[in-house]
Amino acid sequence: GVVPYEMDKDWPLAALEAQAVCARTYAVKTRHPSLGFDVCAGTDCQVYYGRNRATDMTDAAVDNTAGEMIYYGGKPADTVVYCASNGGATEDAANVWSSIPYLVGKKDPYEVKTNIPNYNWSVTYTADELTWILEQKGYSIGTVKNVYVAEFTPMGNVSKVTFEGSRDSVTVKGETCRTIFYSSTYNKSVKSQRFTINGAGAASGGIYINDSNTVIRSLEGISVLSGGGKTVRLDGSASVLSASETSTVGEGQTPAFSKDGTFTITGSGSGHNLGMSQYGANGMAKEGNTYREILQHYYAGTAVG
């Protein structure tokens, strides 16, 4: 009953099989022991509404993979999460929750935009709405004056968002960059970790230095080796030669400074960007990949057995 509610029942068998193995592995990890049960029937765990939507294909996916789970280090993987769509790249769990070795960031060429409903999305907030939302979540920074992405990951997803208010400022990290915008009162939310604010700066903005984790956006006080072999200090932007192109360091997401009191967030994908993309699994299956290949692509270093 889980598979046809979590994934389109008419998708290729390999995608449905991958979903079945994910669901089975997920079920062995309890999420709600304090409430007296293991897993719930909603999107917080796995959607289950009985067998009404089951088909021969979804039943075959379950039967073909009977007893199989995803293993890491010889044990069932305890964080087999997935999302509807990653918007173009998965993310390292360390940049969203905490480090999980088999949940790593990688570009995803298998998601086909034209086949994904609401792949690209946008939502607009007023300064008053954001001020109220932040206050409800314990952040009293005064009237919101500015909001911007403070840091992107190497995959182009958001890892830090800064809110500047009339009294103070606050920077949130990880999954909070997405969830902090949720409001049932205003019926608004940010759908994924992959977005920009007011279109100021692309998700790929900035240059990653040395370890591919540190992004440089301001060059003031930075020392570099010039083409002439001299060490010089910079105070503005500069062009550098990367492995693939000439890029300008110092051009990242800049503060939005909304003139009309609104902030528009534009992004792609849906979910936390971790683990298997369900639409990506669909794309891989259509290209002839098996469910084992799909799972090993999205869960690095794991085995199915």
What are these model-predicted stretches?
Residues 1-305:
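Conserved, single-site charged/polar hotspot
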